[in-house]
Each structure stands twice: as structure tokens, then as C-alpha cells.
Regions:
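Mixed-charge (Asp/Glu-Lys/Arg
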Residues: 1-35, 40-141
Length: 141
């Protein structure tokens, strides 16, 4: 069966929402898909954090890292930190989310994630499973 990108994205978003709810976070989903974020996470203090959810299974031949296209829209423009707070990047084979503050992407349209290596010092590893970005009064870098 051919991969349906929209279906796959919906699956990643559902996984994110389920995990967020398990952690006591509320998730608001806008009607339609015209906004630059997929959902808003509301923490226990009522702070709203705008989240774009992306997922990847892709790993380049010979590479240990998974490549994720972090851009959005038809042009895959870089996420705008004035419009989106956090990129929730799901690496399917490792079943793990990275919660990366969009400002930390520094305009990158694609990123590499290395969840299979526990001792990795790759740029975004500090954000692996970092659900804490949604807690304690809201989004903190």
C-alpha cells in the first residue's frame, strides 16, 4: 500500500495528542488545517503553547540519523517562531518525540535526529522526550 502523507501526519498528531493527555496536558485542535500549527497544548496553569507536529521514518543510506522536514506549507518554509512555539518531531522507528522550541531551529527547514544513540551529543538530543517544555508556567527555552 502506498504511503498517504496526510494519513501518516494525522497518525503522528493522534500519537502526540494521546501522549500529551496521558501527561495531564489538554490539547486544543483548530478546525481545518489552515493555521501554521496543528494544535495548542494547555498546561495546568492555563498557558497555551502552539505546536506543529511532524514525523519521520526516513534515514539516509549509511546514516545513523533520521531526517525530518521541519518546514511547512507547499514551499516547506521554515517555521516562524512568532506563529509556532514548539516543533513536536516524532521519530517513528524509535517511538519517541522531540519537543524543540522553534526558535532553536534557527530557520532550519530540515533537521537530523539520532534517538537510537543514548550517548548522542547531536544538536537536538537535549529535546528528546522533553515534555517539560509544556509545563511550569508554559514554554521555556
Amino acid at each position: 500500500m502506498a504511503i498517504n502523507v496526510k494519513r501518516e501526519g494525522t497518525s503522528h498528531e493522534a500519537r502526540f495528542k494521546s501522549e500529551a493527555l496521558k501527561r495531564g496536558l489538554d490539547v486544543l485542535v483548530p478546525e481545518g488545517d489552515y493555521l501554521p500549527y496543528d494544535c495548542m497544548v494547555v498546561n495546568g496553569e492555563g498557558t497555551k503553547i502552539r505546536v506543529q507536529v511532524k514525523g519521520t521514518s526516513y534515514r539516509a543510506k549509511g546514516s545513523k540519523a533520521h531526517r525530518l522536514l521541519a518546514g511547512c506549507g507547499k514551499t516547506k518554509a521554515a517555521l516562524d517562531p512568532d506563529l509556532v512555539d514548539v516543533l513536536a518531531a516524532y521519530v517513528v522507528p524509535a517511538d519517541v518525540f522531540y519537543h524543540i522550541p522553534v526558535r532553536r531551529l534557527e530557520g532550519a527547514r530540515s533537521i537530523y535526529l539520532s534517538p537510537s544513540f543514548g550517548d548522542s551529543r547531536a544538536k537536538y538530543e537535549v529535546w528528546k522526550d522533553a515534555w517539560s517544555v509544556y509545563e511550569n508556567g508554559g514554554f521555556h527555552e
